[in-house]
Amino acid sequence: MQSHLELGEAEARLAIEACVAELRRRNKVGSIAVGDKHGELIALLRMDGASLPSSGIAANKVFTSSRLRQPSGALGRAALAEGWDVHYHGDIRYLGWDGGAPVFYREQCVGSVAVSGLTGVEDLEIAEIGVNAILATLD
């Protein structure tokens, strides 16, 4: 028998609150997405002033990170290094930009957090703050 864990609404709220707090601390705005282990959205927030495309990009980073169980930017780096298109995975939602971070709990990917609207480095830093906010409440 298999036991499956995945993020829910409560964890999504924690991650979004932590990411928003960090964005405000930096005087920045962006979009934050939290997805389940399949990469489907649980929650999405586009802060006032964030670019319109950032919400769709954050959602695609969540999809990529959860489905591949790795940071979203790893796909882009692999595609560049090996010379293939990220869409070879069969779904146009795969995205190779930094900013999506998987959440691992008990050796399982239970979902992911993504941020969009800043640089890739900043997006990933803030997404990881959301991941850590979730992990701090588990167990």
Where are these regions (language model features)?
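Flexible, solvent-exposed loop/hinge segments and secondary-structure transition points
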Residues: 1-139
